[in-house]
């Protein structure tokens, strides 16, 4: 069955182009031109992903994401923001609110499809079984092994979960609260500074291969896992 994608975009030419590209790549697009019509599309069959413009008649994309996250049936639907707002502050705000990725207009159809597929791989249950590799660092979820080249790295279960999350969500900034929700879960009470402790332990575990540099502190915001030093 084709993956169902809700396209929330008020500019008809862009919306129609995106829907055409999605259909050509085997997706099932569903259109919404404003905030209210997008909310009305949130019913069964649920969208597998939402492409969301920042500015909408009747409300903003940020408000729409907050609406999604309040409802148990929609909070886990991945969101890719599709907007002309390209400033770092705007990107960080979108991601911190709950967007899974961010595409700045103008964009190419190939980039759009590639980013959609990347987000869907991250949320797919099958994806968690694949070995993840980045610059000589590999993580195998099945065997619970982390390697730098041919050498195994030792780390605790929480550091492993933290690294797994980072490696499946690279080049994005996450606040301590977001990391707590993703790695520890929303039903566990843990202080924000606990994240700092496990970040230090993770960096220590990654030192033998020099991969500790990939766990980067973003001052005033949180942490990012990046191959760009």
Swiss-Prot record:
GO molecular function, one term: transcription cis-regulatory region binding
Taxonomy, superkingdom: Bacteria
Post-translational modification comment from the UniProt entry: Phosphorylated by PhoR.
Example of a GO biological process term: regulation of DNA-templated transcription
GO cellular component: cytosol; protein-DNA complex
Pfam family, one: Trans_reg_C
Modified residues annotated as 4-aspartylphosphate in this record: 53
Swiss-Prot/TrEMBL keywords: Activator, Cytoplasm, DNA-binding, Phosphate transport, Phosphoprotein, Transcription, Transcription regulation, Transport, Two-component regulatory system
Response regulatory domain segment(s): 4-120
Residue spans binding DNA: 129-227
Presence of the UniProt keyword Ubl conjugation in the record: no
Database matches in SUPFAM superfamilies: CheY-like
Role noted for this protein: This protein is a positive regulator for the phosphate regulon. Transcription of this operon is positively regulated by PhoB and PhoR when phosphate is limited.
Stated name of the protein: Phosphate regulon transcriptional regulatory protein PhoB
Protein's organism: Shigella dysenteriae
Highest classification ranks of the organism: Bacteria, Pseudomonadati, Pseudomonadota, Gammaproteobacteria, Enterobacterales
């Amino acid at each position: 069955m084709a993956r169902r994608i809700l396209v929330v975009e008020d500019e008809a030419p862009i919306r129609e182009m995106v829907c055409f590209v999605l259909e050509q790549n085997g997706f099932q697009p569903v259109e919404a031109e404003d905030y209210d019509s997008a909310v009305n599309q949130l019913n069964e069959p649920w969208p597998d992903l939402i492409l969301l413009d920042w500015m909408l008649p009747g409300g903003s994309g940020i408000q729409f994401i907050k609406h999604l996250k309040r409802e148990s049936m929609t909070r886990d639907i991945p969101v890719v923001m599709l907007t002309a707002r390209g400033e770092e502050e705007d990107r960080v705000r979108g991601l911190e609110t709950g967007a899974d990725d961010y595409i700045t207009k103008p964009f190419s159809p190939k980039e759009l499809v590639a980013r959609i597929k990347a987000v869907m791989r991250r949320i797919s249950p099958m994806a968690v079984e694949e070995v993840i590799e980045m610059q000589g660092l590999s993580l195998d979820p099945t065997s619970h092994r982390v390697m730098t080249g041919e050498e195994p790295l030792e780390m605790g279960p929480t550091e492993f979960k933290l690294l797994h999350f980072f490696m499946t969500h690279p080049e994005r900034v996450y606040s301590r609260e977001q990391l707590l929700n993703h790695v520890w879960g929303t039903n566990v009470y843990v202080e924000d500074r606990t994240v700092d402790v496990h970040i230090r332990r993770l960096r220590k575990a990654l030192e033998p291969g020099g991969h500790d540099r990939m766990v980067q502190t973003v001052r005033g915001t949180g942490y990012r896992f990046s191959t760009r030093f």
